[in-house]
Amino acid sequence: MAAPAVSGLSRQVRCFSTSVVRPFAKLVRPPVQVYGIEGRYATALYSAASKQNKLEQVEKELLRVAQILKEPKVAASVLNPYVKRSIKVKSLNDITAKERFSPLTTNLINLLAENGRLSNTQGVVSAFSTMMSVHRGEVPCTVTSASPLEEATLSELKTVLKSFLSQGQVLKLEAKTDPSILGGMIVRIGEKYVDMSVKTKIQKLGRAMREIV
């Protein structure tokens, strides 16, 4: 019984992707494929926005949508499963009009509301952000240390990490702190992972000592 529902969703998403661009236009594939319901909506939106050269504008609007939906008053209304769908659509129309969102973003929100998928909005925003990050050639990198790193250390670290990037790629560094690692750092860049924490070194030492005994 699930197949017709999935098929119906696919048709609706395809209709959305072509509703704001010329008919029969070829689908623009995003630079990375995101699976699931959120990925389908995000892919359709990416295709439509790309054809209108409004990727950056839509990205900013989606981040604003995510911010608005986190407001307690708005969330209690449009994300409440007991509130009638027509009321949700009316509330969202008021919001999109006030924010002056583009037809692309407005159509997406309306489609999510009509399909009862507003709870997936944050996932759609996240999927679209992932596509845009790859579109810009950004390589995500997370550096975790026991205490905040000094600016000089961060600057030197960035220089080293950038040397591993390919031409056209941009380093997107995020620094985090986790006192539990005791010292050193953990670096994750793209699909690579390097654990140089004191905690891990102690654990390795403990295992080595047990093997000797």
UniProtKB/Swiss-Prot annotation:
One Pfam family from the record: OSCP
Gene: ATP5PO
Assigned GO CC terms: cell surface; mitochondrial inner membrane; mitochondrion; nucleus; plasma membrane; proton-transporting ATP synthase complex
Transit peptide: 1-23
GO molecular function: ATP hydrolysis activity; estradiol binding; protein-containing complex binding; proton-transporting ATP synthase activity, rotational mechanism
GO biological process: ATP biosynthetic process; cellular response to cAMP; cellular response to cytokine stimulus; proton motive force-driven ATP synthesis; proton motive force-driven mitochondrial ATP synthesis; proton transmembrane transport
Descriptive protein name: ATP synthase peripheral stalk subunit OSCP, mitochondrial
Species per Swiss-Prot/TrEMBL record: Homo sapiens (Human)
Medical condition linked: Mitochondrial complex V deficiency, nuclear type 7: An autosomal recessive, severe, mitochondrial disorder apparent soon after birth. It is characterized by multisystemic features that include hypotonia, developmental delay, progressive epileptic encephalopathy, progressive cerebral atrophy, white matter abnormalities on brain imaging, and hypertrophic cardiomyopathy in some patients. Death in infancy or early childhood may occur.
Job of this protein: Subunit OSCP, of the mitochondrial membrane ATP synthase complex (F(1)F(0) ATP synthase or Complex V) that produces ATP from ADP in the presence of a proton gradient across the membrane which is generated by electron transport complexes of the respiratory chain. ATP synthase complex consist of a soluble F(1) head domain - the catalytic core - and a membrane F(1) domain - the membrane proton channel. These two domains are linked by a central stalk rotating inside the F(1) region and a stationary peripheral stalk.
Motif SIFI-degron in this chain: 5-23
Record-stated family: Belongs to the ATPase delta chain family.
Modified residues (N6-acetyllysine): 54, 60, 70, 73, 158, 162, 172, 176, 192
Keywords: Acetylation, ATP synthesis, Disease variant, Hydrogen ion transport, Ion transport, Membrane, Mitochondrion, Mitochondrion inner membrane, Primary mitochondrial disease, Transit peptide, Transport, Ubl conjugation
Modifications made to the protein after synthesis: Acetylation at Lys-162 decreases ATP production. Deacetylated by SIRT3.
Stretches of the chain forming a coiled coil according to its record: none
Keyword Metal-binding: no
Locations listed in the record: Mitochondrion; Mitochondrion inner membrane
Keyword Secreted on entry: no
